[in-house]
């Protein structure tokens, strides 16, 4: 399935995800498919206390149709494809998103504990998808009051995945006429129990190397059509905290799923994981090859 796939479960997080997905579909001229996973113990009457043993896929589809129309309006809802799947939500979304240009999920769904930063479905999708994925938090906005996207922050570390993230962000910024801020983080090596080794490390040299890496990545991306040049930020400290701090007041964060560190077999790196959990705005995570 190509285009955008968005998970829907009638929660506030799903409403925010659906609105985000609808805007992306219009900008990129992609098809939009809303997916509702249902089961006989997870029905959609608007009353969670009601259990109907005769509940059917047609009833699930009607619930999905009504919800999309409620969130986007009846006219916009006619442009949204619907898919109902009798399966576990994460598995239904991952299967539906095979070949998709973007998978969009709300940060939190109907179930689970409110104290958790990400729900179980969004976490499973985040860790197992091989497609670009957007994590969207619920906000007190309506389609009429949704602000234009003005700032996009991108994490860069010199890896091919971070280059792909910057390219994706630039394409998004070009469509939205938004600014792009590319951030690279650096720090001195941890010498542990051998502090005297640190005298051989020159902070200026490490900072210069980070800036050179950032320049190499940014200069290699076609930024034509942006309202202003890409801003380059060299941050001393942890990459994830630098991205989150810089993104205060931003409208979107874009990071690669895996950077230069960690274990190559993992689909999601520590920076992407931390940013997805703590970001103050929607996050798009780009896998290798996109």
Residue ranges of model-derived segments:
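A short acidic, glycine-rich active-site loop
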Residues: 51-63, 200-213
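Structural beta-alpha unit
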Residues: 13, 20, 47, 51-55, ...
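Hinge/beta->alpha junction and helix N-cap segments in small-molecule ligand-binding domains
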Residues: 57, 158-160, 185-188, 204-210, ...
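Generic structural signal for helix capping and beta-alpha/helix-loop junctions
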Residues: 42, 92, 142-143, 190, ...
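General small-molecule cofactor/ligand-binding pocket signal
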Residues: 33-35, 81-85, 134, 181-183, ...
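Small/aliphatic-rich secondary-structure junction motif
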Residues: 1-50, 150-200, 224, 252
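Gly/Ser-rich helix-loop-strand patches that form or flank binding pockets
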Residues: 23-27, 90, 95-144, 246-290
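Intrinsically disordered or low-complexity boundary/linker segments at protein termini
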Residues: 1-16, 75, 101-107, 124-167, ...
């Amino acid at each position: 399935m190509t285009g955008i796939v968005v998970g829907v479960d009638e929660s506030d997080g799903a409403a925010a995800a659906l609105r985000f997905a609808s805007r992306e579909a219009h900008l990129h001229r992609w098809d939009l498919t809303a997916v509702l996973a249902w089961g006989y113990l997870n029905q959609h009457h608007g009353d969670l206390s009601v259990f109907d043993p005769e509940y059917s896929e047609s009833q699930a589809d009607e619930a999905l149709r009504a919800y999309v129309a409620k969130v986007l309006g009846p006219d916009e809802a006619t442009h949204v494809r619907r898919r109902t799947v009798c399966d576990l939500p994460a598995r239904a979304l991952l299967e539906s998103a095979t070949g998709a240009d973007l998978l969009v999920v709300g940060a939190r769904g109907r179930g689970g504990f409110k104290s958790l930063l990400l729900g179980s479905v969004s976490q499973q999708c985040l860790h197992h998808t091989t497609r670009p994925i957007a994590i969207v938090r619920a906000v007190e906005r309506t389609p009429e009051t949704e602000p234009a996207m003005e700032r996009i922050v991108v994490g860069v570390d010199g890896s091919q995945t971070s280059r792909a993230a910057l390219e994706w962000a630039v394409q998004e910024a070009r469509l939205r006429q938004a600014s792009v801020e590319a951030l690279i983080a650096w720090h001195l090596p941890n010498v542990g129990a051998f502090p005297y080794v640190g005298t051989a490390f020159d902070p200026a040299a490490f900072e210069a190397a980070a800036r050179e890496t950032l320049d190499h990545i940014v200069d290699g991306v076609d930024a034509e059509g942006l309202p202003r040049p890409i801003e380059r930020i060299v941050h001393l400290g942890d990459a994830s905290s630098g991205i989150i701090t810089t993104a205060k007041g931003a409208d979107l964060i874009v990071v690669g799923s895996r950077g230069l560190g960690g274990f190559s077999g993992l689909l999601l790196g520590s920076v992407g994981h931390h940013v997805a959990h703590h970001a103050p705005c929607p996050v798009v995570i780009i896998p290798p090859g996109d």
